[in-house]
Amino acid sequence: MQLDKNRISPGSKNWISFFFHLHQQGELNIGFKFKSHSLEDCLHYIFNQTGLLYGYPVSNLYSPEKYVSHLTSEEKLKLLLFENLFFTYNYYHSNEDDVYESFITSLASFYEHYGSKISLWNLTFDQNKNIKIEKIINERVKLKSKIGDGRYWLNQSSNGLVFVDVLLYSTFLKEDHFDAKALHENIVFNVLFHMTKSAQIDGVIEEKEMRLLMYLLQSSNLDEGIKQQLEAYIRNTLDENIEIKYPSNLLHRKFIFELCVYLNYGTHQVKPDEERKLREIGKHLNLNPSEVEEASLFSRTFILKNRSNLSIINQDKSLSVFYKNIQSKWTRILGRNKEKIVSELKESKEFMDLLSKSTVKDLSNDEKELMKKQFYDILKTMPSLAIFLLPGGALLLPMISKLFPEMLPTSFQENTIDDFEDPEK
């Protein structure tokens, strides 16, 4: 076991054993509980909430801050990848007696299959399985080929596409036989092809966009011939008419589109014509208008939450424009879920008791806060809504008071969505 008993240290040996020890002791717990039986819904939320989709870890899945505050960005990404793999296994096998041993055995089997097909590493293993997985995770996160001084758009020097491992592992757990190489190639090629297409919608690939695309290309683990084809396309020296097979999995297509949105909205202020062309990319990915809108909002919410680390969104004027631009879209998402939200609220006896009381007398400040918390907690159980929540519910509660006036006392409606303030101020 690692030497420091107060920290999880993916840079040290035996950190996986320590992770299991803490989990068994109840020190590590999943930070949410969804009323959803769909792994796809959960992964959609988790990848965006934690930053795994963007190769930029902003939070962990199981590990409290006290165990991980000391970690480098690369170490956080190692832990986050492992946590996501563990979560995926638990989704299918949560009732097993020795879940840790069976998970590691399963994961080792997966990486033996995956790694041999895609030539991810050239390692020999004579250690126990935990140490073997530690070495594999280290290899997966490490970026083998660096560009320039290694400082990319977000100062990243780790593999930006490790989320693909989780998607492939999920398939591995569901299907006895699947072509890991073909699925890996299909997802990664589509990511790079469509992100390049999105970078070109304003007529030019800007420097920050080019650096991000080349960084992801180096993370791709694609065959050299395919990488050369994509690099030529990125550098605009190859005809756009490339034969491409779109992913059949809806979640995979959503992730691809969200990365396209991330590239555009994270690098500059998107104009209406660019937004229209972005929606066309979503349409080409066989997403319907509602799916395009929701996927776009997932990505843009991640940018808003983490804007201090992104260039354009860190400017006050741009932030205000960015926020105003997506308010109405958030409201539509909430509106489409109105019946479901009302149904969940009616199941909460405490909420309904307070609501009933509010019709005959004013609630105390404590009761108002409790009612807000009830509303907030219910939204957190819905993956398609939980992603939009900032700490304290700063963005959603004013909108909710307009959508559900019959479910909230008038005292909750003193703030309007036009009275925007930066939630972090």
Where are each of the predicted segments found?
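Hydrophobic alpha-helical transmembrane segments
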Residues: A386-F388
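Small-residue-enriched hydrophobic alpha-helices in membranes
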Residues: M1-Y376, K380-S384, G393, S401-E406, ...
